[in-house]
Amino acid sequence: MNGIFAIEKPSGITSNQFMLKLQHALTKSQVFSKEIQRATAERKQQYEKQTGKKASKRKLRKVSKVKMGHGGTLDPLASGVLVIGIGAGTKKLANYLSGTVKVYESEALFGVSTTSGDVEGEILSQNSVKHLNFDDLKTVEEKFVGQLKQTPPIYAALKMDGKPLHEYAREGKPLPRAIEPRQVTIYDLKVFSDSLKRDHDYPLLRPTTEEAVDTVKNLNANMLNDVLYFSKEYTEKHGLDSEVAKVEEPFPLSEQEEQEIQKEGDSYRAPKLHFKANVSSGTYIRSLVSDIGKSMRSSCYMVKLIRLQQQDWSLEKNNVFQLTDFTERDEKVWSKVLEKVLDEGATVDVIEELKKAEKEIPADVKECIVSSDQPGDEATAETIETANAEEHSNTLKRKIEQV
């Protein structure tokens, strides 16, 4: 089997770790066993012909599992559509890494900005939220839609003077100069009606240790004073002379608000931002969240992110698999549907086809499904090792989703 399909990544796991789980589930299936055996035999023969020696298990690792890659990282906090290429399909993944349209749904909290732009970062600032109102918030739908200059977050995988931005952040050092803005496109932005409501389950981030506060002080000049831009279309429509937004500084947290937060503690709930955005490749959702906060003279950080769609693969179109389809269903069921998707693409309704395939296979011939969490072959050991190394790298670098 070769081609492209999509699977839903859950929150709380890196894209690479999740892909390796999927890879192991497919590799141990009978569906792919013949192809893997053929590739292994060819590699053995090639190695022995070139070296005159027998190939070790280590030399055969690369061909002893399903060849796989993904078409765009989702960071651990994010869930949603992850495009997967298998076999020769991995060559088509480049088409998904740039120039694609993606749709995201995000939730964020007003009143705090963080180093990473999300719930896992250190607090940079606390700001007032008492002035916020829904009518003003709805204006961001126009202000940010169109061609937009956007400053990437400092934890993005970018470099300055040969040094990754995240290294400056991790060392608590100021950047040599401001981060250059990038041109992106926001095709559509919808703010949902539950925005500014407080009936949610997200506790507000609170300041931690004094040491952490000192560490981020050096970054404030670079991260809090980034230039805010409105879209080219908005500025032209309203006859503005520059795309640089003329918005006053965020309101500081009032003494009354501070007392309220202290009094309510973990039960305090900040007003929520809830929106859906249709964006180009290169758009940083965290930066959009932060910019919306600044445009409202407050601050904002992300608590939830779902990639609803990438090109034609969409959760709303039901053409996306789940990992449990491969780990809990009989492979006679999922293999039939997977083959159809690889042949026909995103037009296939995966959920409907799985239901049909289940009905077509008699219960007495269904195979026993072994949990993918059970210890397996040597490829599994490599999977765990690779995933752990990737997770360690993620902890250090805090790679932020670039969509």
UniProtKB/Swiss-Prot annotation:
The keyword Cell inner membrane does not apply. GO terms for molecular function: pseudouridine synthase activity; RNA binding; tRNA pseudouridine(55) synthase activity. InterPro entries: PsdUridine_synth_cat_dom_sf, PsdUridine_synth_N, tRNA_psdUridine_synth_TruB. Pfam families: TruB_N (PF01509). Its main location: nucleus. GO terms for cellular component: mitochondrion; nucleus. It is found in: Nucleus; Mitochondrion. It catalyses: uridine(55) in tRNA = pseudouridine(55) in tRNA; a uridine in mRNA = a pseudouridine in mRNA. Keywords: Isomerase, Mitochondrion, Nucleus, tRNA processing. PANTHER family: PSEUDOURIDYLATE SYNTHASE TRUB1, TRNA-PSEUDOURIDINE SYNTHASE. Responsible for synthesis of pseudouridine from uracil-55 in the psi GC loop of transfer RNAs. Also catalyzes pseudouridylation of mRNAs with the consensus sequence 5'-GGUUCRA-3'. Belongs to the pseudouridine synthase TruB family. Present with 3990 molecules/cell in log phase SD medium. This is tRNA pseudouridine synthase 4. It comes from Saccharomyces cerevisiae (strain ATCC 204508 / S288c). The gene is PUS4.
